[in-house]
Amino acid sequence: MLPTGVAPAVVHVFGASIAHVSAWNDVPSGVPVYDAGDRIVMAGLVDTHVHINEPGRSDWEGFATATRAAAAGGVTTVFDMPLNAIPATTSVAALDAKRAAATGQCYVNVGFLGGVIPGNAHELRALARAGVFAFKAFLVPSGVDEFPAVSEADLRSAFPVLAELGLPLMVHAEHPAFIREANTARDDGSRGGYAEYLASRPAIAEQAAIELLLRRQDECPIPIHIVHLSSALGLSVLRAARAKGRRITVETCPHYLTWCAHDVPEGATEYKCAPPIRDAGNRDALWSGLIDGTIDMIVSDHSPCLPAMKDTDGNFFTAWGGIASLQLGLSAVWTEARKRDRSPADVARWMCEAPARLVGLDRCKGHIAVGYDADIAIWDADAEFVVNPARLEHRHPVTPYAGRRLRGVVNTTFIGGRLAYHDGAFSDPCGTLLVPSL
């Protein structure tokens, strides 16, 4: 997978970098050769939305298990979200604790994101100096007490600092007023079925949150990134903002592109995420937004938990909101993309190039090109498999993908020119803990 598209080629690796890309029959003698056959050789995926949860909640997920899952899924770089670990990454001390926990455990490259919470605007400069690549905030409760939602006043405090730093603010964009209104109307005797849960997170809340963020951006221009867009209602607002040159990027996730609300079995809380999986027309509109470029990228929002936190007698309100999918994203997206006549080049643009650009790594990751890091995924675009939870590498096997037939099998993953994964076997951890280049 070259910048010009799919073509037969030989990728020459020297040390940790791609030194040369030549014709398919230009194979040098006297050096080790890996023959990928007819498989696709692509830049490794960059996943900028992963909850690893270590330290503090490593019984949910940890660096070793998450990064093994990443390597098995062709993901060569992950970015750890600032919440669900204890402490949350809202100070330099917490970032240091994260790095210490990750050291020596990572099978792929790992970067870190900082958190914006009420009252920590004074910490943001130090976090940037210490090496976070971007910041994250919630407009509604995050689900964990140590990472509270921000108000508009908190945003007004943080925006000038973020403007000075030039780093993106990644936002969980649901407007709290619309969420409160929907939940006020909810029947207290609810059994927590999926239809009720879906109604409690209305699509308009996402559109209104995007509009709120654009108003704040009017006052103080900073790069804004909308995480896990599930509602197509916001697409028209985003298109209009882009037409005016606004610095706003958008991601969606494999689960929003795979399922619709009709597919969610009653009581199957493994499908619970926030914002929720919506109707079929919405899913198709998200695909249209990807294809026309309104949505920039696809990332996992890998958010695992203890199995007991999903086993809540089918109550979607009390179950943990998060889907475990880090190992399966490439296959899930390719399965659906093929149905829409998309190519591996589209997948590379959405899952390699755009996420690398978001975090400022587009000069070294996301492409098979001279001078880029030799982070490489090799996969068979025609092979199919049925998801067997016992073969998933993340800490717990609870996932809505269990039993689903997917197309696209990752065979081999290289990290910085070193073999990290091949056909179910792993080398020793060889990932790097990333810091931004100055």
Give names to the regions the model predicted.
Residues 1-43:
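Histidine-rich, glycine-flanked metal-binding segment
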Residues 48-61, 84, 89, 108-120, ...:
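Active-site mouth loops of central-metabolism enzymes
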Residues 194-223, 270, 291, 296-298, ...:
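His/Asp/Glu-enriched, well-ordered alpha-helical/loop segment
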Residues 315, 370-435:
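C-terminal cap of metal-dependent C-N hydrolases
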Residues 42, 92-108, 155-171, 328, ...:
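Alpha-helix-loop-beta-strand connector modules within alpha/beta enzyme cores
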